[in-house]
């Protein structure tokens, strides 16, 4: 679309997708995950990553935020990205992208996530439109049911061609670009993992100390992309993370409060 801005994304082993932003004037560069499951902007200061220097920006006071100057944990130490930029609603906290919205620059944005980790182009985030090169056919749009996450209702969950009937009373889901896996209620995820042959019933259990299992290495096994999560506050809830968003080009339309899905190309 004319007037749109494209952010190239890097695919980190199908576990996260991140791109570059600039903060301040002149812009200081950071790599962040663009997260539709949160609203805050995190730019941690770490020796292993870029560090935001507030005195180096002439527009330091234009956006309200909290700056942490000391952190005991090392959450981002071994990550390839510097932080997280939230793209959800202001019900959580006022997100940075609302500045673009209030200036009339952006009414929607869209994601394409490449599953092929060997390709140079890891993905694409388009602010203000969508890229026709990365989807086929028309998008199917569903209304946002609650402006906290990009949340919408789903009518059923099928395993193969058979209905589970679990969502007959109604289920909620939200598309979350900051979550690697697809999370859902334990009762259904257990059935899904059993259907695809993922189980631990025949495995022995061996205990390990933190010193033994905290190490850096390549994975040698296949891991199910479905993870169980029972949400008590919102009822049956599905988090459609990158596992879902890779095969489906996803549009987040704030102007019409819709989420759209089309086959990714």
UniProtKB/Swiss-Prot annotation:
State the InterPro entries in the record.
Answer: Aspartic_peptidase_A1 (IPR001461), Aspartic_peptidase_AS (IPR001969), PEPTIDASE_A1 (IPR033121), Peptidase_aspartic_dom_sf (IPR021109)
Record entry for activity regulation? Inhibited by pepstatin.
Q: List the disulfide bonds.
A: 167-171
Q: Pfam families this protein is in?
A: Asp (PF00026)
According to the UniProt record, one GO cellular component term is: protein storage vacuole
Catalytic center at which residues?
35, 176
Q: How does activity depend on pH?
A: Optimum pH is 4.3. Active from pH 3 to pH 7.0.
The UniProt record lists the Peptidase A1 domain at 1-262
GO BP: any one term: proteolysis
Which parts form a coiled-coil structure per UniProt? none
Mind listing the UniProt keywords for this protein, alphabetically?
Aspartyl protease, Cell wall, Disulfide bond, Endoplasmic reticulum, Extracellular matrix, Glycoprotein, Hydrolase, Membrane, Microsome, Protease, Secreted, Vacuole, Zymogen
- Gene Ontology MF, one: aspartic-type endopeptidase activity
State the EC number(s).
3.4.23.-
Tissues where the protein occurs: Pistils.
Question: Subcellular location, in the record's words?
Answer: Microsome membrane; Protein storage vacuole; Secreted, Cell wall; Secreted, Extracellular space, Extracellular matrix
Q: How is it modified after translation?
A: N-glycosylated.
The top EC class is hydrolase
Tell me where it mainly resides: membrane
Q: Which family does it belong to?
A: Belongs to the peptidase A1 family.
Say what the protein does.
Answer: Aspartic protease with a high preference for bonds between hydrophobic residues.
Assembly: Heterodimer of a light chain and a heavy chain. An intermediate form is produced first, and undergoes proteolytic processing to remove the internal plant-specific insert (PSI) and the propeptide.
The molecule here is called Cardosin-H
Query: What species is this protein from?
Result: Cynara cardunculus
